[in-house]
């Protein structure tokens, strides 16, 4: 027999979802059904929480307590870089493996690095910024109209200064 349901217990679930779309409730059902939640309602909550990342795959954290689910987005570096590009959302069914050809300012990259600092293994803001620049290169965008790798080399050589706070 399963243990008694504790109303004060907090459970965390991490799911991958496409921003702004109601996920398939059939995929949610086995994960949240045993916790006493409606998959349809949770799917709508996820769609509401991810609407600013429309069309981009993001990780969603579900905090479940007392049969109430609270959805919050845990953005990855690539999703933050893609939203910083401010491209119009694409149709996922037609366009696959898209290279994003845009330009981002270095200040925006540093701002993304500040957001990702606690999740990163880099000790300094410069090292986290280099991680984000590597992500920008794999996404396919440019930074200050240059290849992101050239900016990484500039940071390593000391030509480009990254603030420490």
UniProtKB/Swiss-Prot annotation:
* Gene Ontology biological process terms in this record: cytoplasmic translation; ribosomal large subunit assembly; translation
* Position of the Glycyl lysine isopeptide (Lys-Gly) (interchain with G-Cter in ubiquitin) cross-link: 130, 146
Q: Does the keyword Nucleus apply?
A: no
Q: List residues, modification Phosphoserine.
A: 25, 38
| GO CC field | cytosol; cytosolic large ribosomal subunit
**Compartments (UniProt record):** Cytoplasm
Residues with N6,N6,N6-trimethyllysine modification: 4, 11
What is any Pfam family matched here?
Ribosomal_L11
Q: How does it assemble?
A: Component of the large ribosomal subunit (LSU). Mature yeast ribosomes consist of a small (40S) and a large (60S) subunit. The 40S small subunit contains 1 molecule of ribosomal RNA (18S rRNA) and 33 different proteins (encoded by 57 genes). The large 60S subunit contains 3 rRNA molecules (25S, 5.8S and 5S rRNA) and 46 different proteins (encoded by 81 genes).
Main role?
A: Component of the ribosome, a large ribonucleoprotein complex responsible for the synthesis of proteins in the cell. The small ribosomal subunit (SSU) binds messenger RNAs (mRNAs) and translates the encoded message by selecting cognate aminoacyl-transfer RNA (tRNA) molecules. The large subunit (LSU) contains the ribosomal catalytic site termed the peptidyl transferase center (PTC), which catalyzes the formation of peptide bonds, thereby polymerizing the amino acids delivered by tRNAs into a polypeptide chain.
Q: What is this protein called?
A: Large ribosomal subunit protein uL11A
* Species annotation: Saccharomyces cerevisiae (strain ATCC 204508 / S288c) (Baker's yeast)
């Amino acid at each position: 027999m399963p243990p008694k349901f504790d109303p004060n217990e907090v459970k965390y679930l991490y799911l991958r979802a496409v921003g702004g779309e109601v996920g398939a409730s059939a995929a949610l059902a086995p994960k949240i059904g045993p916790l006493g939640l409606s998959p349809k309602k949770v799917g709508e909550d996820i769609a509401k929480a991810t609407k600013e990342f429309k069309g981009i795959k993001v990780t969603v954290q579900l905090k479940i307590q007392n049969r109430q689910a609270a959805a919050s987005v845990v953005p990855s570096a690539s999703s933050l870089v893609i939203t910083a590009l401010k491209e119009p959302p694409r149709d996922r069914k037609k366009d696959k493996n898209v290279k994003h050809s845009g330009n981002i300012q270095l200040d925006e990259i540093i701002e993304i690095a500040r957001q990702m600092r606690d999740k990163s293994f880099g000790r300094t803001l410069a090292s986290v910024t280099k991680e984000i620049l590597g992500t920008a290169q794999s996404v396919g965008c440019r930074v200050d109209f240059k290849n992101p790798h050239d900016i990484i080399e500039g940071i390593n050589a000391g030509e480009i200064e990254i603030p420490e706070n």
